[in-house]
A protein has these predicted regions:
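Extracellular glycan-interacting surfaces
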Residues: 1-181
Length: 181
């Protein structure tokens, strides 16, 4: 057997009216940008889409449920599950695959009780000086500290749409750390 000769599509299923440019009755699922698998239950998987939000399956992909429909941005760039507290999931908004139809984000969301009731918190996007550093950008990667789920590292990429810090400068792309997420 060759690696990859038995791939099976598992979703998320096409979204009716998901792409306005293609017409009002076109069913699409969009680009899936990121994926994360629960560290102890492989049937729980999270999938982040370019403009459809975050989806969760609890049955290995048989069915998918959107769990971020009330977020300010449905463009998902990164997903990270806390290794020490897998009910805590961090989601970075903004599509890091910069192209003509990419969407920027508004920061990082934390989802508590992620595999059940999925309580959405955020977006978290302010620096120590209360400047909004992630709106108009994309979050391309999130790493959660292995033993402390409140410590996260975020890679911010692309776009600078209207972001000005308290000092009047545009924040740099790069790696950011938060100790109280």
């Amino acid at each position: 057997n060759l690696i990859g000769d038995a791939w099976v599509p598992i979703g998320p299923a096409p979204i009716p009216n998901g792409q306005v440019a293609a017409g009002p009755s076109t069913a699409v699922s969009g680009r899936v940008i990121s994926i994360a698998v629960h560290p102890t239950n492989p049937n729980i998987v999270y999938a982040g889409t370019a403009q459809g939000g975050l989806y969760r399956t609890i049955n290995g992909g048989t069915t998918w449920t959107p769990i971020m429909d009330n977020a300010q941005s449905l463009a998902i760039g990164a997903i990270a599950i806390s290794p020490s507290s897998p009910e805590t999931v961090y989601v970075g908004t903004g599509e890091p695959n910069f192209s003509g139809d990419s969407y920027f984000g508004v920061g990082v969301y934390r989802i508590d009780n992620a595999s059940t009731t999925a309580t959405l918190n955020g977006p978290f996007n302010l620096d120590a000086g209360a400047a909004n550093i992630f709106s108009g950008r994309a979050i391309g990667k999130i790493i959660v500290h292995p033993t402390n789920p409140a410590v996260i590292f975020v890679c911010s990429t692309s776009g600078v749409g209207g972001i000005i810090s308290a000092s009047g400068t545009t924040p740099s792309r790069g790696i950011y750390r938060c100790d109280n997420a």
